[in-house]
Structures are given as structure tokens and as C-alpha cells.
Amino acid sequence: MDTDSQRSHLSSFTMKLMDKFHSPKIKRTPSKKGKPAEVSVKIPEKPVNKEATDRFLPEGYPLPLDLEQQAVEFMSTSAVASRSQRQKNLSWLEEKEKEVVSALRYFKTIVDKMAIDKKVLEMLPGSASKVLEAILPLVQNDPRIQHSSALSSCYSRVYQSLANLIRWSDQVMLEGVNSEDKEMVTTVKGVIKAVLDGVKELVRLTIEKQGRPSPTSPVKPSSPASKPDGPAELPLTDREVEILNKTTGMSQSTELLPDATDEEVAPPKPPLPGIRVVDNSPPPALPPKKRQSAPSPTRVAVVAPMSRATSGSSLPVGINRQDFDVDCYAQRRLSGGSHSYGGESPRLSPCSSIGKLSKSDEQLSSLDRDSGQCSRNTSCETLDHYDPDYEFLQQDLSNADQIPQQTAWNLSPLPESLGESGSPFLGPPFQLPLGGHPQPDGPLAPGQQTDTPPALPEKKRRSAASQTADGSGCRVSYERHPSQYDNISGEDLQSTAPIPSVPYAPFAAILPFQHGGSSAPVEFVGDFTAPESTGDPEKPPPLPEKKNKHMLAYMQLLEDYSEPQPSMFYQTPQNEHIYQQKNKLLMEVYGFSDSFSGVDSVQELAPPPALPPKQRQLEPPAGKDGHPRDPSAVSGVPGKDSRDGSERAPKSPDALESAQSEEEVDELSLIDHNEIMSRLTLKQEGDDGPDVRGGSGDILLVHATETDRKDLVLYCEAFLTTYRTFISPEELIKKLQYRYEKFSPFADTFKKRVSKNTFFVLVRVVDELCLVELTEEILKLLMELVFRLVCNGELSLARVLRKNILDKVDQKKLLRCATSSQPLAARGVAARPGTLHDFHSHEIAEQLTLLDAELFYKIEIPEVLLWAKEQNEEKSPNLTQFTEHFNNMSYWVRSIIMLQEKAQDRERLLLKFIKIMKHLRKLNNFNSYLAILSALDSAPIRRLEWQKQTSEGLAEYCTLIDSSSSFRAYRAALSEVEPPCIPYLGLILQDLTFVHLGNPDYIDGKVNFSKRWQQFNILDSMRCFQQAHYDMRRNDDIINFFNDFSDHLAEEALWELSLKIKPRNITRRKTDREEKT
């Protein structure tokens, strides 16, 4: 009996503890005349039936008393963890909001500094990317709360304002800006303010949504009156009384009623779920951007816990302090955030809040009279229109000192702060009602805070600006593109995504530059504009002719080129695993790692739909929604008939009929692997070459987008390497964009993966563009795609694509400035520090290799392919530079030898170069090896008298370039080397030319992919060698001695010296090699 009495006593004490923890919930229980139960009320209990307990519980199982104690401890621990997690989330939000404000302040600083320093303009695109990267974590915050319509609408506004900011910076990058245009300054301030308003609203709503479950999920406790009767409980011990007294502080601190003394009056009704009404608290202010919508009731739910006060217990105090700190930040967020980033806000009780609220009118009037100065001791929390984060919009940051010294748009970390002024910004946040326009920034009078800005004057300026822009060919209006958060169906969104049909622009038109005026616009990237013909159009042609001489001289070693066997170029590359690793790495870098799976992963995701009949059924409505059958009619996306004449010319009448019969199905919309394979021409059994022998350009593209199939890695690489031979990069980008936008709006997992794989191919196409291919049209096309991605909320994809674009623009700018930053040795003004004998042969070989490698790694694969097709060195600048370096080195070697007056000196130098060639062979540098060999074996040097041992040694080295069996010796040596290696590109160019001239581009109207596979195989070794780099130190003494090989004689001068040393009428002994030839 003592055991039962003790157990009943402990159970009663536990219930008292639980009542203390849940006392606020008891007080919320509606009761018309009853009072909340007093703490000292004795709660009777049923005696514990020990026999029943032993019957149903196994031996050693915790008794119900232990379970109750564990429940109390678990509830306390979970409350601490929940509040701690909430505090972490709010601190994280506060930190990310700081980063956005810092990024916007940095962007504004760059804009302000453009007026006084044109070089700062180069940092503008990078600063816009910083804003994008700062906002990206906020929109990826908590997927569980993104189902809210309020948050979805807020996301859409953030995306649209961010897209406008990025578009403005991109247009400035392309077209320049008139820095003295006042309307431009006002416009960009409105764009920045719109982004900041959207982010502020997003953070506020996120706090409300995250804070709702904790304070607004009441668990209805059982009423004390409903508890069964039982024997009187034992008196409490001193320790138990002390514990109960300590819990009193927490029960009072967690009280949610506005008046702590008024506990007898219960509310007439229980509060609605998720809504709390706090009496005598200041009403929440309406968000300026949502005038037409009702204020969110959740604002009060976050402000209400501000009435909690601290008390004395250890564990309850810890819980209360965490919750109090969280709610202090929530109160500052909802009341304007004046102390979000500095200082500690005074802790307010409901009564003190009322008292301070009564003083807010006087303080507001004093703020209006005193230029917005506000002391931290006043209740700035109650002013909805004050936020120090907006101060930088009213400041002139052109004199800010903390500008990072970075080149172009280097995405380096942001500066901590650029300084804040003491004059706060008074007025409502930037407001853009539906179809409205931004107001000019500046302090507003109290009467103007709720007035709607006049739309008619803004529309007049907008129309005039549009006329000006239309006349100049610049697009300045911003459309609102459909978003995934709009209340429209997936099919409607899919049909409107590529072609926006919104008749109005909710954001103001942004003018990146102003035509006319007194001040000239700041130029930025002049390479993207069409060159003006200032002279006679007959003058440019001779320049490529001169460069062709260098290319022909480079390939003189291959005068006896014989046709190799076609099977030589059909072999499967041995570096397939390298391409697989590269593909997987790129997917991880770009964020597509989840798309890389096994061979049959596509079929496992979803059953293949019957696409051909489905497409015929959807054709008529698709045309109404803006998707015609031919993708060429969609915003310039080319169809099958938009290719150049070289494709249409070989087509036979039968091929044309078959092509017309296939036009019923849009091949760019196919997603079934079996359907795709049925439209490809596959190889027959026993044939050499790739599995895919041909197909239309569209179906080859669609097949290349199946990047999640490991068996197609080599095919994708071959397509990306050779697509320029049958379609231009601009046309390919348009087709990929069309395919991506066709499937991206769908929520279906399989179609989402198709769109993701398509975008991955598009990013790779952009990443592998040559600098000469980066035209203004392609840049505008890609920047428009970035704008669409941001509007649709695809910030991660937009970030990846934008980074690639800016990297390409940066490389082109550096290439333009390369000639002006060359060292003195490259300009031919450095003096030679000695002779060739002053340096060791292996040291000279290493420095020759470093110079070759620097130029070799700059060559882009498409340059080599385009030269073999078009013989146009203007499109292959890096290849041209590499070949000129080879020729200059060869003539430099000839000149050094021929300028020696004594035969012994000439012999000594020739032996020196033979030793250098030996070390070059060990370094696998075939380029410099053959450059020196071509010099020593040239006619002006070979005709002179040499020692027999020297001539025989030189002949041994010449066997490497023996032309018999299509240069079998060199091909064998090249296949045996291990990277790093610098090959002789002359043979690669000759092979590509042979394949191009010996195979048709099209067979029966379809792209001959077998030809492209041969070209890919030829370029495979070069691509592999470019991946491995040399690890050697640069020796400036030797580099300066080379002097960029600019000090050499022309071929005519070399012949004159050779004839002077040995006239024609003097015979000499022929070597064994000469007798054979």
C-alpha cells in the first residue's frame, strides 16, 4: 500500500508540473463563469491497479509513472529544440538579408561611380551576379512553406524585379550608358528598390510562415474538472514546493493574454486556428505593395509573444530567453526593422507598447521636421516606413572608397560595407501596383504616402522612350513573363512560356542608354558591334592571304602527304572513360548530378508515351496557343528548312518527299528513346564506324540531349565537337532553348529530366563557344534566356548560364587587351644577354616547351575544325598564332646558323640544336622538335658542307617525319607517348582536310554523321593532350634571349647568305639521303 501511495503522490506531482507548463492553454479554454483552475487544487487520482499492470506489461517494462516523467522531459526538451531551431532559422534569414542589402549597395556604388570612372563599368555585370547569388539561398529556404499563395506571389515579384536588374546591367554591358542621364539614375534606383522591397517582403512572410506552427498550434488539454476522483494525495515535500514555485515564472512569462491581472474573464469564443488576436496592441500596418489585399492575420501571431517577460528559473528561463530573442527579431521585422543590424531593441511588454505607441505621432512629426533623424532610444520599431537598409538609395556612393580592385566581373566576395549615412529614408517601400510605374525616390510628405502615383505622365515618357528605342533598334521595355507561381494550368503555362502574351509591363521601362545629348555614352564592349567601313573595302582581303602563307609554311613538312585508310579514323577513342568522368564532373558542377544515372534509367522513370499520335492530336490547339508545328515560327527558332543552301542542295526529290512526310511530327519535341532511335540511320552489322550513321539535324540534336545514358557519352561529345559543320551555334542555341522551354513548365518527373538534360547541353554549347563565335546576336539571345529563367524562378540555372556568358565576355576583353600588355621581349626591343652556348640544351628545350604549351592550350577545338572546312584563319586566331610561332622559331634557327661567318661556328650551332631536339623528344614536344628539324633540313642549310657524322645524325632525326605509309613513324610515336605532349598540328589539319573533301556532308538529305565521327576521332588526341600540363619553371633569361623569335631573316636573305657561303658552281658531296631522293 505504501508503494501505491508513493506512486500516486509522484503522479500527482507530475501532473502539477504539466499544468505549470501548459497553464496558458488552460486559460484559453472557454468558460462562461468558471475560473481557471488554481495551482493548489488537489487533483484526485485512481489508484493504480498493480495486477492489471503486471498482466499487460512485460517484466522490466517502465511503469506508467516513468512514462509520464519521460513525457514531461520530452516535452521540455522538444520545446527547447523547437525554439532553438526557430532562432537559428531567423538568424539565418537575417544574415542572408544582410547579404542582399550589401550586394544591392555594392551594385548602387558601381552605378554611381560610372559617372566618374569608366573602368568601373566593367564591374557592373559581376555586381548584378552578386545580387543573384545573394538572393538564391532565400528562394531555396523551406520547400514546405512554398505552397502559400502569398509567398508564391512574393516569389514572383522578387524574380521579376531581379530579372529587370540583370537585364539592365546586361544592356549597359552591350550598348553602353549615358552616365549623366538623370532619368537613368532614377530608373536604376527604382529597379534596385524593387528588388529590395521584394526581398524584405519575402523575409517577412517567411518569418511568419515559419513562426506560425510554434505559437499557433494549441494542444487542447483535458479539463481539471473532468478528471476522475480518487484518494487524497500526500502533502508535497519542500523540494517539490520549491520546484513548483520556480515554474511559476515561466507560466507567467508564457502568458499570452494582454492583461496579466485580468485572468477571470475568458474570451467568449475559442480563437480560430492559426489566428491570434491581441488586445491593446498596435494594429499591423498594411504592406504598401499589397494595398488591395487584406492584411495577413499572421502578423499578429509573430508580434504577440513580445509580451513575455524573463523570470528566474534555470530551464524555463533558457526556453523563455530563446523565444524572447526570436520574437524580438520578429517584432523588428514587422515594424520596419530599424534595429535589425545594429543595437538591441528595448524589450516591450504590452502596456509599454501601448505607451510608446501613443507617442509615435509626436515622434513621426518630429522626424518629418528633422530630416528623418531618429534616435535609438525612441520607439522606431513602431514606424512602418523607416528602414536604414534603404538609406543607400538616397546617398551618392560615387565617393565610396571600398571598391574591390578586381578585373571585369570577377565574382569575389562582397565588401563588408561601404558606409552608412545618418540620414534615413522616409517613405513607403517601393510600390508597383498592377500596371503601374515606379515613383521617383525621395522623402515623401505624410499625405503622399497612400496616394496612387499618376500613371499618365509615366506612360507618356515610356511611349516616347519606346519610340526612341524602336528607332535605334534597342529594346527597352520589360515584359512580365509567365511564372510557375501564376494561377494558370500547366498546359497554358507551357504554351505561353516561349511567347509571352502579357499585354502590359508591370515594371517600368528601363533605358540603358540615351541616344543624342551632349555627353557621349560610355563604351564598354566594342568588339560586339559591327565594324564600320572607314576605308576602301578592297583593303581587308590581303590580310588573310598573308596569314595563309604562314599556314602553308607550317604544313610544308607534309608535302608528300598520302591518303590514309578510312578505317584509321573509325576506331573508337581510347579515352572514353575520360569523357565519362568529364561529363559527370560537369553535371556536378552545374548542379545536374541527379540526372546522371545508368543506361536504362530513362525507361525506368516513366513509361514511354505514344508520341507520334499524341503529337498529331495536339497539333491544332498547339498552333492556337503559340506553338506552331514548325519551331522556326516560334521567336526565330529555326526549323528544318532554315538551314543554309549547302544542306538543301544535295537533297534528291525522294529525300524531299520523305522530309515533307516527316514534318507532321516535331522532332524537337520527341522524348521517347525508341522513337528517337527509329528516326536515326544506324550502321549495319559488320560495318565500321559509329552506331549512328546519319539523321536530320533536329533528331541528332535530340539524341545528344539524352545525357543521362552512359552509352551515349561518346556520341554527345562527337556531336558537340562537330555540330558546326552542319548548323551554326546560334541556330543550335535557339533549338535547345525551344526544347527546354517546351518541357520545363511540366511537373512530370520524366519531362523535367528531359528539360534539365537539354539545358545541360545548352550550357556546354555556350561553354565551348569560340571567342570569334561570341557575336552580339548570340549574346543578346543568351541574355534574353537568362531573363526568362529568372522570371520563371530558375535562379540556379540562370546563375550557371550567366556565369558562362560573363566568362566568355571577359576572355574576349582580355584577348583584345593582350597586345597592349605584351612584355618588352615580345615587342622586339629587348637586347640579347648572350649566345645560345650560354645555356644548357635541356634548359633551352624546357623553355621552348613552355612557350609552345602556352599557345597550344589556348587553341580551341572548333578553330581547328573550322579551318579545315573553310580555310579561314580569321576564325582561328589562336591556331594562327600557334603556327606563326612555329614558323618564326624555324626561321630564327636558320638565321642564327647562317649569320655565323666561320664554318666551325655553324657546325657547332647545328650540333647544339641537335642536342636540343633530343631533349625536346624526351619532353614529347613534337612541335618545337619539328620546327628545329625543318630549319636544319631546309635547302639553304642542307646545301652547305657539313661533317659526315653531323649529316648522318641529322638524317636519323629526319626519319620521324618520314612520309611513307602516311607518316606511320610519327603516328606510331604519337600514339605511344604519355601526356603531357604537344603534337605537330600540321598532320591533324591535313587529316581533317582529307576527311572533309573526301566525304559528303549529307546523304539522302540527312546529315552524314559518319563523317563527323571521323573528324571527332582525329581531334580526340589533341583534346586529350590539352588536358595535361607541364610542370616546369620559367627562365626569363632564356625567354628574353629568344625575343619571341622576332629577330630572323627572310627566306630570300637566307638564300643570299647560303649562296655567298657556297656559290652555285662549287659542287659538294651528296649525302646518302640526297642520293636516295
UniProtKB/Swiss-Prot annotation:
Its main location: other. Guanine nucleotide-releasing protein that binds to SH3 domain of CRK and GRB2/ASH. Transduces signals from CRK to activate RAS. Involved in cell branching and adhesion mediated by BCAR1-CRK-RAPGEF1 signaling and activation of RAP1. Plays a role in the establishment of basal endothelial barrier function. Plays a role in nerve growth factor (NGF)-induced sustained activation of Rap1 and neurite outgrowth. Ubiquitously expressed in adult and fetus. Expression is high in adult skeletal muscle and placenta and in fetal brain and heart. Low levels of expression in adult and fetal liver. Phosphorylation at Tyr-504 enhances activity as Rap guanine nucleotide exchange factor. Keywords: Endosome, Guanine-nucleotide releasing factor, Isopeptide bond, Neurogenesis, Phosphoprotein, SH3-binding, Ubl conjugation. Residues 213-228 have a biased composition (Low complexity). The gene is RAPGEF1. Residues 688-810 form the N-terminal Ras-GEF domain. The modification Phosphoserine is found at S281, S293, S314, S335, S360. The lineage of its organism: Eukaryota, Metazoa, Chordata, Craniata, Vertebrata. This is Rap guanine nucleotide exchange factor 1. PROSITE patterns: RASGEF (PS00720), RASGEF_CAT (PS50009), RASGEF_NTER (PS50212). It is found in: Early endosome. Residues 207-235, 248-300, 336-376, 411-494, 600-670 are annotated as: Disordered. Transmembrane segments: none annotated. One of its GO terms (molecular function) is guanyl-nucleotide exchange factor activity. Pfam families: RasGEF, RasGEF_N. Residues 660-669 have a biased composition (Acidic residues). Interacts with HCK (via SH3-binding sites). Interacts with CRK (via SH3-binding sites). A motif (SH3-binding) lies at residues 281-292, 451-462, 538-549, 606-617. The modification Phosphotyrosine is found at Y504. It comes from the Eukaryota. The keyword Ubl conjugation applies. GO terms for cellular component: cytoplasm; cytosol; early endosome; intracellular membrane-bounded organelle; plasma membrane. Residues 484-494 have a biased composition (Polar residues). Residues 840-1064 form the Ras-GEF domain.
